[in-house]
Amino acid sequence: GPLAVAINAAYMQTYIGGVSCPYICSRRLNHGVLLVGYGSAGYAPIRLKEKPYWVIKNSWGENWGENGYYKICRGRNICGVDSMVSTVAAVHTTSQ
């Protein structure tokens, strides 16, 4: 399921689409989002291969980003996205 993550949202404010890799983004966390998926797409000229990314669902509505979603580079803790991750685990108990 989705993971709750914290991120630095400075570069999210101007995002309109594609895979965002703001390497100069601070890792100071200031916004909560949901990590809902991952993938790889596009051409990364530096490495001559596809760019892996996380798919983030934001709370700013469907008119922001790609219908309310954000793709950010995966694997380098860009904007602190890998720093604070939370999930919920269900515990099933039996009653006697």
UniProtKB/Swiss-Prot annotation:
InterPro entries named in the record: Papain-like_cys_pep_sf (IPR038765), Pept_asp_AS (IPR025661), Pept_his_AS (IPR025660), Peptidase_C1A (IPR013128), Peptidase_C1A_C (IPR000668)
Entries under Pfam families matching the protein: Peptidase_C1
Source organism superkingdom: Eukaryota
GO molecular function per UniProt: cysteine-type peptidase activity
Entry keyword set: Disulfide bond, Hydrolase, Protease, Thiol protease
Enzyme class: hydrolase
Protein name: Cysteine proteinase
